[in-house]
Curated annotation (Swiss-Prot):
Name of the protein: Fluoride-specific ion channel FluC 2
Record bears the keyword Membrane: yes
Species for this entry: Nocardia farcinica (strain IFM 10152)
Regulation of catalytic or functional activity: Na(+) is not transported, but it plays an essential structural role and its presence is essential for fluoride channel function.
Keywords annotated in UniProt: Cell membrane, Ion channel, Ion transport, Membrane, Metal-binding, Sodium, Transmembrane, Transmembrane helix, Transport
Gene name of the record: fluC2
Transmembrane stretches, start-end: 7-27, 45-65, 77-97, 106-126
Primary site of residence: membrane
Length: 140
């Protein structure tokens, strides 16, 4: 029988970086949703744009921190887990789909459901590709 995997000790600096990034990301998302409110029964474009933009940004970030740059050890936890994790939102996306369905906007809900997933995946692919192209990482 193999020994159970050991969980590494929690690093206070990493936890702080994630917390600060997450707070900033959530604040940015809140401000965008305040500046771009969604009327009842309409597609929540603010959340859509936030999620797709965040997916593009995580694609760029992961190439930069894993393939192109030597970075500070706190950049990935701060920007990836914290900032972009706090900025994007799956729970709000799910709630907004339910809200659209309850308001009778079934086509909008289904379009938002599928469109977000497809656009988010495209965002990651495009972000990764753009970062590799811009840094020359694809040629290494």
């Amino acid at each position: 029988m193999s020994a159970p995997a050991r969980v590494p000790p929690l690093d206070p600096a990493i936890l702080l970086a994630i917390s600060l990034g997450g707070g900033l990301g959530a604040l940015l998302r809140y401000l965008i949703s305040t500046w771009w409110p969604t009327p009842p029964g309409h597609v929540p474009w603010a959340t859509f744009v936030v999620n797709v933009t965040g997916c593009f940004a995580i694609g760029v970030l992961m190439v930069l921190v894993t393939e192109a740059w030597v970075t500070h050890r706190l950049l990935r936890p701060f920007a990836g887990v914290g900032l972009l994790g706090g900025f994007t939102t799956f729970s709000t996306y799910g709630l907004e789909i339910r809200t659209l369905l309850e308001s009778g906007a079934v086509l909008e809900a289904l379009g938002y459901l599928a469109g977000t997933v497809l656009a988010a995946l495209a965002g990651v692919v495009l972000g990764t590709g753009a970062a590799r192209w811009a840094t020359g990482a694809a040629r290494r």
